[in-house]
Amino acid sequence: MVARTPQKQRKVAMVVPPLNSDLLKETINKVDKCMERLQELQYTIAGGTKVVSGVNLSPRSTRIYLKTSLRCKQETLRIKNATNKKSPVGKFPASSPGDWRKMSLPAMLLGETVNEILQASQVTRDIVDAIAPKKSRKSRRLTMSQEDDGPKTPETQQKSREQNPETVSSNIKARRKKEKQNRRSESDSPPSLQRARSRIAFRTISPQVKGNNGENSFRHLANRVSPKHKPWVKKAVLFPNPLFISGTATQQAKFSRTMSPVIARNEISSIKNNKETPYKFLIKSPPTSASKFQVKIRSPPKVLVSPTRNGSNSVRKSPRGSRSPTRTVNLGKKSASISPIRNTGKRSPKLSTAAKLRRSFTPTRNGSNLARKSSISPKRVTLQAFLSPTRNGNFCKKSPKASISPTRVCNKSQKLSTAAKFRRSFSPSRLAMRFVSPMKSRKV
């Protein structure tokens, strides 16, 4: 037998229109979401900073703004010309008909749309309440709470079948007793087996494989050896420190010539032991064929003559003993000449070039120059000057045969610089003596 519905219920079903209440509920939820978004838009247009779907909204950022502004102008003209000045029901109240003009156009449009959506949602809710079958009050409350808070999963009926807490606790106690009994039985067995169960079982390697690997280990590991496994290989250093390199002195000298802030080890030891002047301050001897204007200092002078003493010595000497700095006279097989200024064995402290230039213009210096140059001729050298050691101021107390070169006088003389010679040649005392000295030298 097929069960049939009673006639009363059949009539009611035929009268009710075919509307799906679930579909209407979904539409209401969608309308509510649209309302939230429109409220955000309204807040943004009114001057707020709300963001909708990650985009900052401003009234003039869209193309629709221009279209709606044009529509707003048309609407204002239509309202002015219309006879009926009352606003429609559901829009702005009649008491303030011109207030909306003060607002911006998008704000006005949004306000109208929000009101319309609210009305539509209310109508649909009324329809749903009328169409839905009458249920108990409890079910209505559940549906209302679901609509307010959103959809929820229905509660399962298994909660009614839950065991009492006393039975749950008794089950837990029974389980613990069983575990304790199992542990006691395991403790009777040897502990090594118990530990081995918890350990990791490593895979054993057969001895044949081990032997093969031992024979050809270098071949297999050739491409995979890291530098820490090769201690015999020197590490590559990008910027080596020459202090820790055991190389020759020339290699380390090359390093020090560069501008690196590293001091060579051998150079430090050599400077400490020898205490010699470094190569930068070595004074090289001039070449043998050096011209007059290419004068180089050969070595730091150790013997200098003070001007006053030099002048007194030159006064005592005979005018016949003339000395020229350019000519030499052969005495037997050896050449002998005397440099013009440095002709005494007495020593004086070392003088700088600036001090020499200052002294050349002092009055005492000029006087000594007059006295000295009266007895010196630049052209001839007599034999008496070389044969009489007493007149020459006892040059190192040596025999007259000792050769005296213009560059060396007992290895304690020093050449004048070219600049000093030129300055001295233009002094008034020197010019005066230029006229006198040739006559004296001719008399000899």
UniProtKB/Swiss-Prot annotation:
UniProt keyword Metal-binding present: no
Keyword Nucleus attached: yes
Biological processes annotated in GO: phragmoplast assembly; regulation of phragmoplast microtubule organization
Keywords: Cytoplasm, Cytoskeleton, Nucleus
GO molecular function: microtubule binding
Annotated signal peptide: none
Primary location class: nucleus
Any one cellular-component term (Gene Ontology): nucleolus
Compositionally biased intervals (Polar residues): 205-216, 307-329
Compartments where located: Nucleus, Nucleolus; Nucleus; Cytoplasm, Cytoskeleton, Phragmoplast
Region (Disordered): 131-218, 290-354, 390-409
Superkingdom of this protein's organism: Eukaryota
Stated role: Is required for spatial control cell division during plant development. Through an association with microtubules, acts both for the positioning of cytoskeletal arrays that establish planes of cell division during prophase and for spatial guidance of expanding phragmoplasts toward preestablished cortical division sites (CDS) during cytokinesis.
Binding partners and assembly: Interacts with POK1.
Protein name per its UniProtKB record: Probable microtubule-binding protein TANGLED
